[in-house]
Design a protein with these regions (language model features):
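Juxtamembrane and boundary regions of transmembrane helices in multi-pass small-molecule transporters
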Residues: 86-181
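Core transmembrane alpha-helical segments of multi-pass membrane transporters/permeases
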Residues: 1-14, 30-38, 189-193
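Flexible loop linkers connecting adjacent transmembrane helices
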Residues: 10-22, 95-97, 128-130
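Hydrophobic transmembrane alpha-helices that form the pore/transport pathway of multi-pass ion
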Residues: 31-111, 128-129
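Membrane-interfacial entry segments at the cytosolic side of transmembrane helices
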Residues: 182-190
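Residue-level signature of transmembrane alpha-helical entry/exit and packing/kink sites
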Residues: 24-29, 134, 138, 162, ...
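Transmembrane alpha-helix boundary and packing residues in multipass membrane permease domains
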Residues: 5, 9, 53-54, 87, ...
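Hydrophobic alpha-helical transmembrane segments and adjacent interfacial helices
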Residues: 28-40, 143-153
Length: 193
């Protein structure tokens, strides 16, 4: 029952259309490149896409653009559910999982960056064009995610590199978008982190 309630909450869209196109484009970005991938690394099984689709629908995007944007979190699938698929793949090709994941991180990071223009096109098709200033900011967030994904494989166990890369950038993005307003809010944010 709890799983069904979580699924319903994820896909039942709130009415966020009144926020404006710029805010919706940022919501779409966060869903596709940060929250969706983070959720995918924690749970696997396409749950990142389920959560992303909930936000995408809440932004008023439907049909093919929603489906295409919703699939973007799957780029991080080698770390999905903490990476059992990568472990099996490494065993099959007789390569240490850390090495395979580190090599895959380069490919995933490049794919995230290369898919940005397609994402911007799909946002426009969905009624939320991304202006150049937003594109620059979004590219920096994706670059930070890609750099962390690659760099963390040198210092952390491969199973958590996707979670750490997406989680750190997601946290920074949310704090940047909604900074704490007072000392009490700062304490709550620090405790939550």
């Amino acid at each position: 029952i709890a799983g069904g309630l979580v699924f319903h909450a994820a896909v039942a869209p709130p009415d966020n259309r009144a926020l404006g196109t710029a805010s919706q484009a940022d919501t779409l970005f966060t869903a596709a490149f940060l929250l969706g991938p983070f959720t995918e690394t924690v749970t696997g099984f396409g749950v990142g896409t389920v959560f992303a689709i909930g936000l995408i629908r809440g932004a008023g995007v439907a049909g093919v653009p929603a489906a295409l944007i919703g699939l973007l979190p799957q780029i991080i699938i080698p770390w999905g559910g903490l990476g059992p698929g990568t472990a099996v793949g490494a065993a099959l090709v007789l390569v240490p999982p850390q090495a395979l994941a580190a090599r895959t991180a380069w490919q995933a990071g490049a794919m995230l960056l290369l898919l940005l223009p397609a994402f911007w096109h799909w946002c426009r098709l969905g009624g939320h064009p991304v202006v150049p200033r937003q594109r620059a900011r979004q590219a920096l967030w994706v670059l930070a995610t890609a750099a962390l994904l690659v760099g963390l494989h040198h210092v952390a166990p491969w199973e958590v590199c996707g979670l750490l890369a997406t989680g750190l950038v997601l946290s920074a993005r949310l704090l940047h978008a909604h900074p704490p307003r007072d000392a009490a809010a700062c304490r709550r944010a620090a405790i939550a982190a």
